[in-house]
Amino acid sequence: MKKINVAVIGTGWCGGIRAEACAASPFVNELHIAEIKPDRLKEVAAKTKPVTASADYRTLLQNEAIDAVMISTTPEPTHYPIAKESMLAGKHIFLEKPIALELWEAEELIALARSKNLRFTIGYSQRFNPKFALVKRSIDDGTIGQPVSALVSRHITRNLGKKIGGRVKLSPAAMEATHDIDFVLWCLAPRKPVKVYAQEVRKIMGAQYNVPDCVWIIVTMDDGTVFTIGAGWVLPPSYPNFSSTWIEMVGTEGAIMVDDTHRDVYVTTMQKGIQFPISTMPGEKVAHVYAGPMEAETIHFLECIALDREPLVTAEQAKMVMRVYQAADLSAETGQPVELAAEYVPSLA
C-alpha cells in the first residue's frame, strides 16, 4: 500500500469533515490544509495536526510532495479555477459538487485530467448512504425487476437554504436535486436521459436571493422509464432536522421505499423541543463513530489514490448530471419540456 500526501482546500463544514477523515486514515502520510478564515484554520489544525496549515491554497499546490487535493471551497464559482490550478500542478482531484458552473468548464477539467492521467471525482456523497446503496443493489440484482419509475423528495430547512441560496445564484435543481439526479441516473445506468420537464415556485426566497423555493423535475429515460425529483430549501426553521428525503423506486417485479427523514432517532428537551440530531446530508461525528456518508466517501477517494483504483463517481457522470439540472432550469424558465440530444446539449422540445 502506498501512503499518500493529501491537501484539503477549504475546511468549512464539509472540508472539516474531510480533513478529520484524512487525518485518521492509514492511507495518509501527510495532511495539508488551506482555509481563508483564521479562526476556522486554527480550529481544524488543532484537530487534525496537519504538516501545513495555510491561508493560501497555492502554497499547497506548489508542494510537489502532495499527491491529491480535496477541494471543499465556497462559494461554488471557486470550484473550476482551483480545480484547474490543482490539475496543472499534477494533483489528483476530489471536487465537491457542482463540477463547475458552465459545461465548457466541466469539459475542460475532464479533458485536462485525462491528458495528465489524473484521478478526478465529484462529491456526490449520497451514493455512500447505505440506504441509497440498497436501492441500487435491488435493481442490479433483479430484486425489483426492471425499473418503471422513481420518486425522490428532498427538502432542507430555510436556515440552511438561505445559507446556500444566499451565497450563489444557483437553483435548488443545481444545489439540492443534483444529489438525487446523480443517484437515480446511477441506479438506472446504462439508460440515458432524453427529456426533462420542470416547474418551480417563488414565494419565499425569490425577493431576497432571487432563487426559487423549490423545483419539481420529471426526467424521461431512453427506455421510457420516468423519474420525478422534488427539491427545496424552505422547510420552516422550527422543523427538527436539516434534511428530509423520501425515495420510491418501482420496478416490474417489486418496489423499494426509503425513509431518510431521520425520524428514527429524536431528542426532546425543555429548551429546544424535538430535534432529529442525526439529520444532516454529510453526516456527523457521534462519539467514536461517524453517522452519515461523507466520511466513507472521503475514505473511498483516499483508497482510489493509494491503491490506484477508479472512483465510484466519474467526472463524466457529474457532467451528465449538470446537463440534466441545467435542462431543468431551462424548462422551469420557459415552461416547456427540454430534449437532451445524443451529445446532451439542452434544446427546447
Describe the function of each predicted region.
Residues 3, 8, 28, 68-70, ...:
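C-terminal helix-rich "cap/oligomerization" subdomain common to oxidoreductases
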Residues 72-73, 154:
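Glycine-rich, N-terminal phosphate-binding loop of Rossmann-like dinucleotide-binding domains
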Residues 68, 75, 80-127, 142:
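Beta-strand-loop-alpha-helix segment that lines the small-molecule cofactor/substrate pocket
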Residues 50-57:
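Conserved SAM-binding strand-loop segment of SAM-dependent methyltransferases
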Residues 1-48, 72, 184:
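N-terminal Rossmann-like dinucleotide-binding module
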Residues 130-158:
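Rossmann-like NAD(P)H-binding beta-loop-alpha module
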Residues 207, 222-296:
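NAD(P)-dinucleotide binding in Rossmann-like oxidoreductases
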Residues 160-244, 316:
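Rossmann-like dinucleotide-binding domain that binds NAD(P)(H)
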